[in-house]
């Protein structure tokens, strides 16, 4: 049995929705145990509420538990072309895992969201840098998801990983095409994890 963690941060719910789609895809794979968790919120509760943050039900992960999984699929919104501060703070606490090589050889993949499209690919590839320092095997999705070829509408999605475009005010929710790409990413990573660890 391969253990897959979908680990995310979501302020307004876009990445949370994508995380559930990623997990749904991963659960299609026989031999995959899939768990969804989120990183801790670093914003004071009153500021989070004032900013319109969405309360989420996923359990909160600890950095140390990352070593328990065969694959980790990270989801983060874009903040100026980088991962969110909450995800960065969480990953900055993995120094002990790095020192012991606890994540070496584990699969790592990334999905993201952005307001208007700018920075979505940069967010994924800049997150890969942290995964590389841990010795993780980075898993992009390539162009196997057919939705990536659809240019008839505005949508997220890259060969690096699934993405969604939230709109400048956050009112746009992930489209069916974006969720389909996210499901593909989950299924693809879980399939590889089962092959390697099953």
From Swiss-Prot:
Substrate binds at residue 98. Binds 1 FMN per monomer. Pfam families: FMN_red (PF03358). Residues 4-189 form the Flavodoxin-like domain. One of its GO terms (molecular function) is NADPH dehydrogenase (quinone) activity. This is NAD(P)H dehydrogenase (quinone). Keywords: Flavoprotein, FMN, NAD, NADP, Nucleotide-binding, Oxidoreductase. GO terms for cellular component: membrane. Its cofactor is FMN. It comes from Salmonella arizonae (strain ATCC BAA-731 / CDC346-86 / RSK2980). PROSITE patterns: FLAVODOXIN_LIKE (PS50902). Its EC number is 1.6.5.2. InterPro entries: Flavodoxin/NO_synth, Flavoprotein-like_sf, Flavoprotein_WrbA-like, FMN_Rdtase-like_dom, NQO. HAMAP family: NQOR (MF_01017). FMN binds at residues 10-15, 78-80, 113-118, 133. It catalyses: a quinone + NADH + H(+) = a quinol + NAD(+); a quinone + NADPH + H(+) = a quinol + NADP(+). Coiled coil: none annotated.
């Amino acid at each position: 049995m391969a253990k897959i963690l979908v680990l995310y941060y979501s302020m307004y719910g876009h990445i949370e929705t994508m995380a559930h789609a990623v997990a749904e895809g991963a659960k299609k794979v026989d031999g995959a145990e899939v768990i969804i968790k989120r990183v801790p919120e670093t914003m004071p509760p009153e500021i989070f509420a004032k900013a319109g943050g969405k309360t989420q039900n996923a359990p909160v992960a600890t950095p140390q538990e990352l070593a328990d999984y065969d694959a980790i699929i990270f989801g983060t919104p874009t903040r100026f072309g980088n991962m969110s501060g909450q995800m960065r703070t969480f990953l900055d606490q993995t120094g002990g895992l790095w020192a012991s090589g606890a994540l070496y050889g584990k699969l790592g993949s990334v999905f993201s969201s952005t307001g208007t499209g700018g920075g979505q690919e940069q967010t994924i590839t800049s997150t890969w840098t942290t995964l590389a320092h841990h010795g993780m095997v980075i898993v992009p999705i390539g162009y196997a998801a057919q939705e990536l070829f659809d240019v008839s509408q505005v949508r997220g999605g890259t060969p690096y990983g699934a993405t969604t475009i939230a709109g400048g005010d956050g009112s746009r929710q992930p489209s069916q095409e974006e969720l389909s790409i996210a499901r593909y990413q989950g299924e693809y990573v879980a399939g590889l994890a089962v092959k390697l660890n099953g």
